[in-house]
């Protein structure tokens, strides 16, 4: 065993490729308000800071495309419709990234505590993990509404340290975006940056994680 006792993971872009379902849900909601349909590769650049900011970025794009704006009530209604569609399509097109399930199972068998720390709406976290048969592997699930602050704030990692009686150096975090790297480093935790996720089309290495991996299974190499 290494110095690490707990390993925390981001969800979207780290464990699960949820982009197809997120794009479907944005576009379904947009269609109801006569807004343009966004391609997946564009929706990818809006992911990572929670649903409210995703919608804000989407609306800014739609305004630039069409000049159309929504009033506050319409924006609230749009967010509700996005939430409805995403609730209906949590795992319709989404898939686990390669080697995620087997690696998580190996880590659990080795005695590591596992946790999810995501900015995704809290109510969606457990259902997504359950759909892929991995929810039972985690000792804690933190979503966008679990705590007063979300990544890149370090609060979720401080919370994990407090709950499990750990020092930051005993926590390893794994993510795919600059928000993950910043949260971990601010908290004093080591962090893995994965190259395949959603980082606004910016190489994750530019955020200076402690390790950069192309394959989820490579996490095991630093825990031997």
UniProtKB/Swiss-Prot annotation:
Cofactor(s) listed: Mg(2+)
Gene name per UniProt: gph
Active site: 10
Classification via InterPro entries: HAD-like_hydrolase_sf (IPR050155), HAD-like_sf (IPR036412), HAD-SF_hydro_IA (IPR006439), HAD_2 (IPR041492), HAD_sf (IPR023214), PGP-like_dom2 (IPR023198), PGPase_prok (IPR037512)
Annotated positions binding Mg(2+): 10, 12, 176
Superkingdom per UniProt: Bacteria
Cited PANTHER family: PHOSPHOGLYCOLATE PHOSPHATASE
Catalysed reactions, semicolon-separated: 2-phosphoglycolate + H2O = glycolate + phosphate
GO molecular function, one term: phosphoglycolate phosphatase activity
Keywords annotated in UniProt: Carbohydrate metabolism, Hydrolase, Magnesium, Metal-binding
Protein known as: Phosphoglycolate phosphatase
Pathway(s) this gene product operates in, as recorded in its UniProt entry: Organic acid metabolism; glycolate biosynthesis; glycolate from 2-phosphoglycolate: step 1/1
């Amino acid at each position: 065993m290494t110095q690490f006792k707990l390993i925390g993971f981001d969800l979207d872009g780290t464990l699960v490729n949820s982009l197809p379902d997120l794009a479907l849900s944005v576009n379904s909601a947009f269609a109801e308000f006569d807004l343009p349909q966004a391609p997946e590769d564009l929706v990818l650049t809006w992911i990572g800071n929670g649903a409210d900011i995703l919608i804000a970025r989407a609306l800014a794009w739609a305004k630039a495309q069409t000049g159309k704006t929504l009033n506050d009530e319409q924006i609230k209604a749009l967010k509700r419709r996005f939430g409805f569609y995403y609730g209906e399509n949590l795992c319709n097109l989404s898939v686990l990234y390669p080697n995620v399930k087997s690696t998580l199972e190996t880590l659990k068998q080795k005695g590591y505590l596992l946790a999810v720390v995501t900015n995704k709406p809290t109510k969606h976290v457990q259902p997504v993990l359950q759909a892929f048969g991995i929810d039972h592997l985690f000792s804690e699930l933190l979503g966008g509404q679990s705590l007063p602050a979300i990544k890149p704030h370090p609060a979720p990692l401080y919370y994990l340290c407090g709950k499990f009686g750990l020092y930051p150096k005993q926590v390893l975090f794994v993510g795919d975006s600059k928000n993950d790297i910043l949260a971990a480093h601010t908290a004093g935790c080591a962090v893995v940056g994965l190259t395949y996720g959603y980082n606004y089309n910016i190489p994750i290495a530019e955020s200076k994680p402690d390790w950069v991996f192309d394959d989820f299974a490579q996490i095991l190499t630093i825990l031997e």
